[in-house]
Amino acid sequence: MKLPTLTFAAVLAIVALAAPHAQEAAARIEALHFHHVHLNSTDPKAAAAYYPKPFALSAAATTFNGFEAVKTGNVYILFTKVATTPQNELTGPQTSVWHFGWNTPNSRKYDENFRAMGLTIAQMWDAADGKLVDLSSDTLPGLPTQEQILEMRAKGTQPTLQGGFGYLRGPDGAMIENAQSGTTERFNHVHMYHEHPECAMQWYTEHLGARRPAGRGGVAAPAATGDCHTKTYAPPTWPSFAKTGFVRDPAGSVNFDDISISIRPWPGGGLVSTRGKIYDHWALSTADLEVTVTRLKREGVKFLEEIHPWGNSRAAMIEGPDRIAIELVEVK
């Protein structure tokens, strides 16, 4: 039996159908850019004045679109005045936003400066049976489990005291990371909790055009195949804000421009809406809000707020995985 010959056009069609779904999604999504993090504050002006203290090279207090603000690089931190101190992870149920933060060229020197300025450090436990420390490099290396900590102690292993990450406790209880990387101080990430990190990454990619970080050789990291729901979480490791340790994996991240939406798992789910809490939402900008809103509605994305005036522009609000509120602002 003679098999039919495929035409060149048919071959091209097959290749096109076989292209990764994430690449197709990115190609059809209009450009969205990271715009701001929006906090609730009892004193927005004082809150905005805080950030240039720890991050003097990259943060400046200003106003934007009617809000007290911090300008850092190409993004803003905005503040809305509220009557009572907003809930954070210490005073209320956990939301999907864990913290946001800066890359710094020397996290230990920055930490020393923070203490000299009298800023509050959010310390971490270095082990289940250990002590509170400022930086991850004050702990035994490698983000170890308690079993690994005991093994390293027996071998005489010591903390490196080089680089690492630590945290400030800022105005209204906001947590702000100081993470050594590169040679330039810059705002670089929002750190999220998601029950199913892979599902969240797929959602950000498919609906918002986020990019997965490049792997080895600069090649885009491929999306995982099959069921994205997490079946097994890694054991807890240290340092940790909880003495019982912190579940760090499976983790992940996506990028909007050079801002990372970094993800740690939240086993068991139950994260509450970010609205009204310390980190109310974060925002992306679009050149054509009507186009973006129409597409997202067609894709079945949940809307919290329809298109409305936003200062001298317009905005809308959607809800993403684990009840993260994401504002869409129009920037022509």
Language-model features and meaning:
Residues 42-58, 110-117, 196-212, 296-299:
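Amphipathic alpha-helical segments
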